[in-house]
Amino acid sequence: MSLKDQLIHNVHKEEHSHAHNKISVVGVGAVGMACAISILMKDLADELALVDVVEDKLKGEMLDLQHGSLFLRTPKIVSGKDYSVTAHSKLVIVTAGARQQEGESRLNLVQRNVNIFKVIIPNVVKYSPDCKLLIVSNPVDILTYVAWKISGFPKHRVIGSGCNLDSARFRHLMGERLGIHPLSCHGWIVGEHGDSSVPVWSGVNVAGVSLKALHPDMGTDADKEHWKEVHKQVVDSAYEVIKLKGYTSWAIGLSVADLAETIMKNLRRVHPISTVVKGMHGIKEDVFLSVPCVLGSSGITDVVKMILKPEEEDKLRKSADTLWGIQKELQF
């Protein structure tokens, strides 16, 4: 009789049923691992699967997380280069791809990452045909479109992390200026995640008090307080962090875990995330841009109709045109 048999009397033989709240992360670079640890710390999954092509790094990251099991509430952490480890996922987060170099625009990464997605997406779909796909790899808006096209999924199940982080950065910087926690500073950044994102100044408020009503020059060149600089800092922030530490990881990891929580718990919170915007704000092409979306366990169920100023709509359409110009040239 083994020690285990002496210690434990078995009452019921469990059939090996699969996890009920499984999350998979594709890519165990800095961003993928920041997503993984943020998700583990929020107790969102009963199983976490990691996938990558670099096997030693992958196994090392898995073991390192498993060694912290005592301090976590996620009983199963697995990894493999084969996508069978991701089977039956509720949510699959894709962070894999070529990394943005210092000074490189997100759009420059495109074709390099499309080729990577041609391998990843069909494998994800094969093992988790009912999952939600959350795309994080840059340029996120275009790659979300690519994932949608390759997967054949309905659009509500293919989500780009989009401006969830840009808006968080904006609210942080707004909070720094006002001496108020970002949770109480409300403001939305929409459009492209990156250089042509659009700050919606008309909606910026604290406790329902419109800052633009108090300070009409806000966000314009005439503004003596230079609030436009806050949006410029948001746009520059990734470049600054990349210049200083080589990559960004923690904020995007936390931002992705925030989205994962909304999905896994069916919270129906509104997030600025990337979805198909055809037919909205005068956009005629199949492009993905961030707009305020109601998010839950089936993915994106609704979009909040923002009231934008004509110049804000123009910027959004310009973003759409830029993205479409690139998308229509893609080979996949």
Curated annotation (Swiss-Prot):
Q: Which residues form the active site?
A: H193
The domain of life is Eukaryota
The terms under GO molecular function for this entry are:
L-lactate dehydrogenase activity
Q: Note the CDD domains from the entry.
A: LDH_1
- What SUPFAM superfamilies does the annotation carry? LDH C-terminal domain-like, NAD(P)-binding Rossmann-fold domains
Q: What is its EC number?
A: 1.1.1.27
Predominant location? cytoplasm
Q: Which gene encodes it?
A: LDHA
Q: Which terms does the UniProt entry file under GO BP?
A: lactate metabolic process
Protein name as catalogued: L-lactate dehydrogenase A chain
